[in-house]
């Protein structure tokens, strides 16, 4: 990837919100595409979700995408808003309660808090994956230092 393209990818990562993830099915072994939001907190990319949709919204309901990433952590992170680019990535399931609390407390994850009404439910049950980019995008500086677009707002 050229330096100009890497700069465009960095800008997109800081500005965009909706991506596709292409994962290998945990049980089926088939490639699955899921549209999902991502957030950038403290220079790291995260995929998050609300705990579930049971009788009690705070109950945990498993998600296929997270089951797929647990079984097969390498996946494709597909930018599709301001630019189109497919990035190789590795998922790291976030279990550390301090990291989970820090991410779910960030301004950019306010939508998730509003959906559940409980930071504690998110910390305890919300799906969360840290995304490590691989290949030429590995090591991109996703902090807000330098000239970058303003961060996007999650509705």
PLM segments and residue spans:
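Extreme N-terminal tail/first-helix region
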Residues: 1-20, 150-155
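Short, structured beta-strand-loop surface elements
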Residues: 51-148
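Short beta-strand segments
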Residues: 16-57
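Short, P/G- and charge-enriched loop/turn segments at secondary-structure junctions
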Residues: 6-9, 25, 115-120
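Short low-complexity stretches enriched in small and charged residues
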Residues: 1-7, 33-34, 40-47, 84-88, ...
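A generic structural micro-feature
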Residues: 13, 28-30, 69, 123
């Amino acid at each position: 990837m050229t330096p100009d393209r890497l700069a465009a990818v960095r800008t997109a990562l800081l500005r965009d919100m909706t991506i596709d993830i292409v994962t290998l099915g945990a049980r089926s072994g088939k490639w699955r595409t899921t549209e999902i939001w991502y957030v950038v907190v403290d220079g790291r990319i995260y995929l998050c979700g609300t705990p579930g949709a049971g009788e009690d919204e705070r109950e945990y309901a498993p998600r296929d995408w997270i089951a797929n990433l647990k079984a097969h952590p390498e996946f494709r992170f597909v930018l599709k808003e301001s630019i189109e680019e497919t990035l190789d990535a590795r998922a790291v399931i976030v279990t550390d309660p301090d990291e989970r609390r820090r991410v779910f407390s960030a301004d950019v994850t306010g939508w998730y808090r509003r959906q559940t009404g409980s930071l504690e439910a998110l910390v305890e049950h919300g799906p969360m994956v840290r995304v490590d980019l691989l290949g030429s995008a590995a090591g991109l500086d996703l902090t807000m230092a330098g000239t970058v677009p303003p961060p996007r707002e999650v509705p």
